[in-house]
Amino acid sequence: SENIEAIEFLKRVNEIVHSEHAGAITVAEESTTFAGVTKPVAEGGLGFDFKWNLGWMHDTLDYLKEDPINRKYHHNKMTFPSMFQFTEKFMLVYSHDEVVHGKSPMVGKMGSGYWDDKIATLRALYAYMWMWPGKKTLFMGDEIAQGHEWRYDESLEWSLLKYIQHEGVRRVVSDAAKLYLEDPKLA
């Protein structure tokens, strides 16, 4: 069942934000199949500008956690998100939720193998992410392949950039972001 009061509240919040703060965006972290999250309120939607594509995030991570030799049996995890890609205005996201509480840093999610293999897979993931339609966001430290989970009371491991593998991840993210800004088809 739907909570009608909550739905109306979200619609009203989005109407107020958009009418009183030109250029502001609202983003929904919403993992159900509730339709119309990013549809305008005037058209019966909730009026959010974007919705996190949590399905894409979970499917890609599930695929990349597989041992590389077994990934051929799981290609559907990489293709399934295209089935609903244009049902909402999605934002691809790897958030803080994915790099805390024993879940490991992003590089630790890249299947089995040597560290260099994991770093290469992470670079491939970020290139794939930036070439997939929609807006993107990474959590701090993801762009340098931070070696440990996020710790709110510590700085990022900027010293990792002296290593070519970590600098390579940073460069892929930077180059992909530049391409994204230059080519509207990627947005």
Describe each region flagged by the PLM:
Residues L156:
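Active-site beta-strand/loop architecture of penicillin-binding DD-peptidases
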